[in-house]
């Protein structure tokens, strides 16, 4: 009569809580690099699925923190599949993270997630968002015109990387492997692109049934990790 879902417990809250704890205290570059590596590898995995999945709402509130500061991407409420070269047209996501092509309703693809990666990196590095506005129209205008509010003390390597990601033209944005190959990541992570795993390469999960000796206990289906 019942269906039980056994879900992972991620006990350290989300990245937003980490940033907002003390805005005067910056996160270390090492921590930023490793948190972003986890998010980027998750996005890469989604984009390599068949068909590809775009998340469309990557932001600090949607990145959970597990023990050891392992970042886990969550909340797929705005996600969707990509079919062939067809672009999506739904205006969705959180305004301060919207890519220009979503604002302009010209159609969008996986590159909207790359844009959000740049926004997230900016926020982790500075504690602020790159595009400001007292109202939604001013915000949209600043995004369209690429009016980025750069802090004077931002790490030069991070600024260089963000500048390569936050491009108005989606085709001009660097790819996910290029992001992880940037000097900012290679400085703090050994061979960061090794974490880019495709669905075909990942260890597979197979369901199996667990039961007890008590006939009154319902069987439980668990997704067990097995190597093909």
Predicted regions and their residues:
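Structural helix C-cap motif within protein kinase domains
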Residues: 126-129
């Amino acid at each position: 009569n019942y269906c039980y879902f056994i879900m992972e417990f991620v006990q350290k809250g989300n990245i937003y809580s980490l940033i907002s704890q003390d805005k005067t205290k910056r996160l270390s570059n090492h921590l930023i690099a490793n948190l972003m590596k986890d998010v980027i590898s998750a996005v890469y995995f989604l984009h390599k699925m068949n068909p590809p999945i775009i998340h469309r709402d990557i932001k600090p509130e949607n990145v959970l923190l597990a023990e050891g500061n392992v970042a886990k991407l969550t909340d797929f409420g705005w996600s969707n599949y990509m079919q062939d070269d067809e672009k999506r047209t739904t205006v969705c996501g959180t305004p301060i993270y919207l890519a220009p092509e979503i604002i302009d309703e010209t159609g969008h693809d996986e590159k909207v997630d790359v844009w959000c990666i740049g926004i997230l990196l900016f926020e982790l590095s500075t504690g602020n968002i790159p595009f400001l506005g007292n109202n939604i129209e001013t915000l949209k205008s600043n995004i369209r015109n690429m009016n980025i509010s750069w802090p004077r003390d931002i790490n030069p390597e991070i600024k260089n990387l963000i500048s390569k990601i936050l491009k108005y033209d989606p085709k001009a944005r660097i790819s996910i492997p290029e992001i992880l190959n940037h000097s900012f990541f290679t400085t703090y992570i050994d061979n960061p692109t090794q974490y880019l795993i495709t669905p075909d390469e990942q260890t597979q999960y197979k369901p199996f049934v667990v039961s007890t000796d008590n006939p009154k206990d319902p069987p439980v289906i668990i997704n067990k990790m097995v190597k093909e």
